Amino acid sequence: MALSKDDVLNAIAEMSVMDIVELISAMEEKFGVTAAVAAAPAAAGPAAAAAEEKDEFDVVLASFGEKKVGVIKAVREATGLGLKEAKDLVESAPAPIKEGVNKAEAEELKKKLEEAGATVELK
């Protein structure tokens, strides 16, 4: 009469920890295997990261340059902020202007801000 899986599991559940350790050692010897955890695969290298192109970007104002007023106007247009909020945002550079936007919108916003005199980064 062969034991079912449930019978084996119930027998193991009733064993002490020392008995289970001995059982594992005996299984390793009998089957020529080890119960050690396999090493995790290495993280993907830069080539794999480059293959996965981002689809969401954060537009970050790095600095406002010499044309602060023009940059404030461009930030107001892009974000819909009021004058004071846009001014505070520009003066707190580096600061995120928009977060989680698609590539086309991020590139367009970067172009507008750079035309206004700002230094912009896409992250």
From Swiss-Prot:
Instruction: Output the superkingdom of the source species.
Output: Bacteria
Q: Name one GO cellular component term.
A: cytosolic large ribosomal subunit
Q: Name one GO biological process term.
A: translation
Entry-linked Pfam families = Ribosomal_L12, Ribosomal_L12_N
What UniProt keywords apply to this chain's record, in alphabetical order?
Ribonucleoprotein, Ribosomal protein
Concerning InterPro entries, the annotation shows: Ribosomal_bL12 (IPR000206), Ribosomal_bL12_C (IPR013823), Ribosomal_bL12_C/ClpS-like (IPR014719), Ribosomal_bL12_oligo (IPR008932), Ribosomal_bL12_oligo_N_sf (IPR036235)
Q: Does the keyword Ribonucleoprotein apply?
A: yes
Q: Which Gene Ontology molecular-function terms are recorded?
A: mRNA binding; structural constituent of ribosome
Q: What does this protein do?
A: Forms part of the ribosomal stalk which helps the ribosome interact with GTP-bound translation factors. Is thus essential for accurate translation.
Alphabetized PANTHER family for the sequence: 39S RIBOSOMAL PROTEIN L12, LARGE RIBOSOMAL SUBUNIT PROTEIN BL12M
Q: How does it assemble?
A: Homodimer. Part of the ribosomal stalk of the 50S ribosomal subunit. Forms a multimeric L10(L12)X complex, where L10 forms an elongated spine to which 2 to 4 L12 dimers bind in a sequential fashion. Binds GTP-bound translation factors.
Query: What family, per the record?
Result: Belongs to the bacterial ribosomal protein bL12 family.
Q: What is this protein called?
A: Large ribosomal subunit protein bL12
Q: Which organism is it from?
A: Psychrobacter cryohalolentis (strain ATCC BAA-1226 / DSM 17306 / VKM B-2378 / K5)
Gene that produces this protein: rplL
